[in-house]
Amino acid sequence: MGRGRGGYTEKQPSYKDSGGHKVTDKGAIFVAERYMDQGYEAVFRRRHDPDRGCDLTIKTSDDENIVKNIEVKAITSNNPSKISTRIGEAAGQISEGDTVAIFFPNHRNSQTGRTLAEAGIAEARRKGYVKGPIEVWFSDKTCEHY
């Protein structure tokens, strides 16, 4: 056997960034797959490039027009202060007008999840960490825009 419990039901895709390195950031992969489901192209930015700017570039399906640049942070904390800090880290890595996406792998899009996200976002905006758009992705593959 040797494949661990359960094995795989399907082949797991392996993504590479623009520098040819394997992408291991589960949050970036999750957000990219959601945009691919909507018909967009997702380009993973090179991790080892200090000037990379963002995790993902989302393009139209014809690969011509850039829709948006996104910096993704996966957040497992239930503390709004820690969430705002992670949002600030993401905002510090991107240009003005680019999008910050936060991914909650442990929360569904419920009142509890939205309240937690809104508290963290409100604190991040109050502290001046971020002025641009923020996307909140939940484990049930839904998104809220702030």
Specify the residue positions occupied by each region the protein language model found:
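Charged, structured surface patches that assemble and position nucleic-acid processing machinery
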Residues: 2-54, 68, 72-146
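Active-site beta-strand termini and strand-to-loop segments that position acidic
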Residues: 56-63
